[in-house]
């Protein structure tokens, strides 16, 4: 994907890598929120590095019931159907069988699962990496076949993305370049851009932004600062875990972005404020784990004092 981006004339830089003793550099980077940082091999001593291989997980948790996404599309930014159409309940062992036989054109994913609900969260030592700051944290597990994708999106909180098994690529874009991400008019945290096939006629501002890219292997940790856009793709069968922490982005940052995006975005926000806020109509779920629309989030900010209500993973 990096070569294709370069061929389109885009600027792509490697994510900086911490030295071998990377915890100190990681803490300094997190304190400054200066940008993404790769810490290679930082997780090699974690029990999860060996205990969370697909085979080991099946041996310990094969009978556990899970809800997975099967036969996912391999192209496009939005699901062609509501996400619920891809959901299936099955045993974890059955899911791993599906995952290992899935072709790249119909990947499957056990995604966005709280770690403590299915596996032993003590296998991942985030306490040594994140000093307590009074803000809720949340840890999620992502297990899937080659070809699984989390399209370009932005999260409210700082994120440690950890690769335990297999390989994934991550492409990032700074929050300050959010206009180049071309958010959906009704959803400021999801991008219309598919970085695998970037349409430069539709999205010309990409040429003026800087993308950052990294390929992750087992034992690697990637720090993603809050707000930074990121696109994640699996090259192989993969087991990942991520940990959100710290103070979330607030309503002021999103209002500032909304202000520069223009009338199309203001109109969509006003519509959804009424339709999904005041009238409480259900929103569609064609994004990957769809967050509330911007209008609904502004409604929540006014009514409940919480712009991230329903989108802060530590509270959902």
Regions found by a protein language model. Give the residues of each.
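N-terminal accessory scaffold of Fe(II)-dependent oxygenases
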Residues: 1-221, 229-316
């Amino acid at each position: 994907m990096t070569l294709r981006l370069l061929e389109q004339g885009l600027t792509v830089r490697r994510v900086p890598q911490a030295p071998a003793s990377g915890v100190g550099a990681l803490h300094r980077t997190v304190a400054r929120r200066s940008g993404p940082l790769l810490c290679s091999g930082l997780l090699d001593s974690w029990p999860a590095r060996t205990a969370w291989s697909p085979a080991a997980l099946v041996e310990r948790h094969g009978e556990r019931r899970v809800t997975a996404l099967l036969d996912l599309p391999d192209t496009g930014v939005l699901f062609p159907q509501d996400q619920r159409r891809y959901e299936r309940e099955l045993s974890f062992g059955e899911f791993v069988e599906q995952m290992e036989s899935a072709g790249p054109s119909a990947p499957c994913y056990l995604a966005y699962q709280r770690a403590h609900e299915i596996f032993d969260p003590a296998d991942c030592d985030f306490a040594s990496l994140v000093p307590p700051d009074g803000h809720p944290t949340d840890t999620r597990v992502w297990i899937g076949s080659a070809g699984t994708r989390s399209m370009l999106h932005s999260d409210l909180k700082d994120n440690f993305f950890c690769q335990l098994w297999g390989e994934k690529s991550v492409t990032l874009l700074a929050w300050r370049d959010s206009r180049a991400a071309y958010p959906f008019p009704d959803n400021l945290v999801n991008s219309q851009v598919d970085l695998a096939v970037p349409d430069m006629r539709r999205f010309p501002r990409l040429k003026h932004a800087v993308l950052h890219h990294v390929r992750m292997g087992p034992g690697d940790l990637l720090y993603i600062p809050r707000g930074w856009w990121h696109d994640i793709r699996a090259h192989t069968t993969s087991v990942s875990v991520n940990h959100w922490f710290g103070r979330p982005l607030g309503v002021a940052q999103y209002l500032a972005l909304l202000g520069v995006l223009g009338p199309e975005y203001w109109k969509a926000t006003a519509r959804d404020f009424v339709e999904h806020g005041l009238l409480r109509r259900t929103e569609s779920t064609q994004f990957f784990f769809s967050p509330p629309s911007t209008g609904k989030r502004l409604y929540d900010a006014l009514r409940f004092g919480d712009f991230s209500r329903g989108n802060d993973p530590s509270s959902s």
